[in-house]
Curated annotation (Swiss-Prot):
ATP binds at Q100, H291, A292, S293, D294. Keywords: ATP-binding, Cytoplasm, Ligase, Nucleotide-binding. HAMAP family: RTC (MF_00200). It is found in: Cytoplasm. This is RNA 3'-terminal phosphate cyclase. The keyword Transcription regulation does not apply. Catalyzes the conversion of 3'-phosphate to a 2',3'-cyclic phosphodiester at the end of RNA. The mechanism of action of the enzyme occurs in 3 steps: (A) adenylation of the enzyme by ATP; (B) transfer of adenylate to an RNA-N3'P to produce RNA-N3'PP5'A; (C) and attack of the adjacent 2'-hydroxyl on the 3'-phosphorus in the diester linkage to produce the cyclic end product. The biological role of this enzyme is unknown but it is likely to function in some aspects of cellular RNA processing. It comes from Hyperthermus butylicus (strain DSM 5456 / JCM 9403 / PLM1-5). It catalyses: a 3'-end 3'-phospho-ribonucleotide-RNA + ATP = a 3'-end 2',3'-cyclophospho-ribonucleotide-RNA + AMP + diphosphate. The lineage of its organism: Archaea, Thermoproteota, Thermoprotei, Desulfurococcales, Pyrodictiaceae. The active site is at H317.
Amino acid sequence: MIVIDGSIGEGGGQILRTTLALAALLGKPVRIVNIRAKRPRPGLQRQHLTSVKAVAELASARVEGLELGSTTLVFIPRGLRSGRFYFNIGTAGSITLVLQALLPVTAFAPGPVEVEIVGGTDVPWSPPIDYVRFVLRKLLAMFGFEFEIIVKRRGHYPRGGGRVVLRVTQPPHVLKPVKLEERGKVLRVEGLSHAVRLPRHVAERQARSAEAVLRSKLPGVPISIDLEWYEPSRDPHLGPGSGVVVWAVAEHSVLGSDSLGAKGKPAEAVGREAAEKLLEDLATGTALDRHASDMLIPYAALACGESILGGARLTMHAWTNIEVVKMLVPGAEMEFIEGGKLNEKFKLRVKGICYKPSS
């Protein structure tokens, strides 16, 4: 049994999610210790419990240590399954972080998969659901992995109540390598500004602010930010909550950024923050924003051939994913061909193992 130290790197939930996904696919029993050792509340929280339950269901896994606050987990996968599944985090815990653990597994499921998850769609310390819909989904399509994300209802901290459906109609069973080095010319910028259980002007001000910052730095580039808002009598959300996601469609890639509303935070600051983060990442010229560059590493390790990932910033999450891949997928070869220092832009060459479910 492989032992993974959950305190390495960022020492949070990322190690758990990547370990679960890779162990499920490769059929490797793992024991994860020191789970979330570097967090104020160590051990498994509700969102992590749901991640474990979800991957365990799809991998027919036997699990030990599945309880709130547990710092040790044993995960023994016994074969991938397809079908329809339902998971309720029970709080405003992040749906997108559960998806982060689940998505790689669904790419290799024996048949169609549909998963409904209840929790938070737009919550702190995790990618918003619109980032997954409009950025990550497009990047994973380049690996040959296509799926649908249906947002039935948004959920914000602290009440949650969001409902998202993941639908994988045709799991690819094999991933293509990608060359995502430079982004190329920025063709257009799109976005979505939402506000639920709040006045319409919140969504409008977020969008206007983001658009103004982007126009000042990207002259001549078409910019379009849509609004999502609901009449109070027809608003199905628990709310209140708001946020904006913006993404640049470039010749060779898509890069995204986001910002969440918060009590006391002006809507203008929300829009400005999202736009400035996107501009920072675009300024590097790389194909991937600071978030996507860590999320794609496990996929590249499983792909058939050599991928190159050019990231705007080497985050601790990316470094952590590299270390977990080294432990669980030793056949994957990884080397920095540019950069390699934290918080600097980088290019990573990944020679994947051409994983197939029967292998």
